[in-house]
Swiss-Prot record:
Region annotation (SBD) ranges: 90-282
Role of this protein: E3 ubiquitin-protein ligase that mediates ubiquitination and subsequent proteasomal degradation of target proteins. E3 ubiquitin ligases accept ubiquitin from an E2 ubiquitin-conjugating enzyme in the form of a thioester and then directly transfers the ubiquitin to targeted substrates. It probably triggers the ubiquitin-mediated degradation of different substrates.
Region (Disordered): 1-28
The protein's name in its UniProt record: E3 ubiquitin-protein ligase Siah1
Provenance organism: Danio rerio (Zebrafish)
The protein's annotated pathway: Protein modification; protein ubiquitination
Length: 282
C-alpha cells in the first residue's frame, strides 16, 4: 500500500453579588450537597476551601476572590483575617463537586484531592493544540476539530494509518514548527515537528504525535515515526499524547523522536525531510 505524502510548511514561531444561600435541610441529617452549598463563594460560586477566613460577621469568600475585594460582598463589613476552624472541620467531611460539573463531570471528592483532580479532569476545557502561543482558543473536545478547520486552514490533513510527513525548508534559521493532521480509525491525530535553538547555535528537532481525544482514548493507539533513506533508518515508537496534556512536557523530557541537525541532514533531500508516520491500534 503506497503512502500518502503531505507537505508541512513551517509555521514560524457591577452589581453586588447575592448573599450566601443557606440550604433548607430536610430531616435531621444534612445531605452532602446541602453541606457543600454552605461553602459556595458569593462572588464566583466556586467553593471556599481550607484555610477558611471569614469577615467579622462570619461570611465566607474563596481565596481567589478575597484578594480582589476591599470589603465583605455580603455585609459590606471589613474582611478581616479571622480563621473559621469550625467550618474547616466540616469541610474535611464533605465531598465537593468538581469545578467542571456543569460540563459533565460527576466526580465528588474531598477538598484535599480537588485541585489535583481538576488539573487532570477530562471535562476541563481543551486548549488549541497547535504549537506556539499565538492561539489562545479554549473549548470542548468536540469543538477542537471545527476550530482547527476554520482557524488553522493551512494545516494539511491526510487519510490513512500509514503516511509521509514532509517538512519543508528545515534549514530555516531559528525556532520553527511544522504541523499536519492524520485521520484514521475514526480519530484525528496531530503530527508536530519542532526545531529548537539550543546553546551555541546548536539546534535540535523533536517529532511527536498527539491524539485529538482524551488520555484514555490515546492509550488505545501506538505511533511509529521513521526516518529512512541512504541505507539508514531511525525509528521511534510510543503511545500518542492526548491534546489534553499537550506535548510541551514530552518535548522537555525528550520523550519523543529527537535528533540534531547533523542527523537531519543524513535523511534530508534538498532541505526537505520526510518522516514516515504509522498509527496502529493496540
Amino acid at each position: 500500500m503506497s503512502r500518502q505524502t503531505a507537505t508541512a510548511l513551517p509555521t514560524g514561531t457591577s452589581k453586588c453579588p447575592p448573599s450566601q444561600r443557606v440550604p433548607t435541610l430536610s430531616g435531621t441529617t444534612a445531605s452532602n450537597s446541602d453541606l457543600a452549598s454552605l461553602f459556595e463563594c458569593p462572588v464566583c460560586f466556586d467553593y471556599v476551601l481550607p484555610p477558611i477566613l471569614q469577615c467579622q460577621s462570619g461570611h465566607l469568600v474563596c481565596s481567589n476572590c478575597r484578594p480582589k475585594l476591599t470589603c465583605c460582598p455580603t455585609c459590606r463589613g471589613p474582611l478581616g483575617s479571622i480563621r473559621n476552624l469550625a467550618m474547616e472541620k466540616v469541610a474535611n467531611s464533605v465531598l465537593f463537586p468538581c469545578k467542571y460539573a456543569s460540563s459533565g463531570c460527576e466526580v465528588t471528592l474531598p477538598h484535599t484531592d480537588k485541585a489535583e483532580h481538576e488539573e487532570l479532569c477530562e471535562f476541563r476545557p481543551y486548549s488549541c493544540p497547535c504549537p506556539g502561543a499565538s492561539c489562545k482558543w479554549q473549548g470542548s473536545l468536540d469543538a477542537v476539530m471545527p476550530h482547527l478547520l476554520h482557524q488553522h486552514k493551512s494545516i494539511t490533513t491526510l487519510q490513512g494509518e500509514d503516511i509521509v510527513f514532509l517538512a519543508t525548508d528545515i534549514n530555516l534559521p531559528g525556532a520553527v514548527d511544522w504541523v499536519m493532521m492524520q485521520s484514521c480509525f475514526g480519530f484525528h491525530f496531530m503530527l508536530v515537528l519542532e526545531k529548537q535553538e539550543k546553546y551555541d547555535g546548536h539546534q535540535q528537532f523533536f517529532a511527536i504525535v498527539q491524539l485529538i481525544g482524551t488520555r484514555k482514548q490515546a492509550e488505545n493507539f501506538a505511533y511509529r515515526l521513521e526516518l529512512n533513506g541512504h541505507r539508514r533508518r531511525l525509528t521511534w515508537e510510543a503511545t500518542p499524547r492526548s491534546i489534553h496534556e499537550g506535548i510541551a512536557t514530552a518535548i522537555m523530557n525528550s520523550d519523543c523522536l529527537v535528533f540534531d541537525t547533523s542527523i537531519a541532514q543524513l535523511f534530508a533531500e534538498n532541505g526537505n525531510l520526510g518522516i514516515n508516520v504509522t498509527i496502529s491500534m493496540c
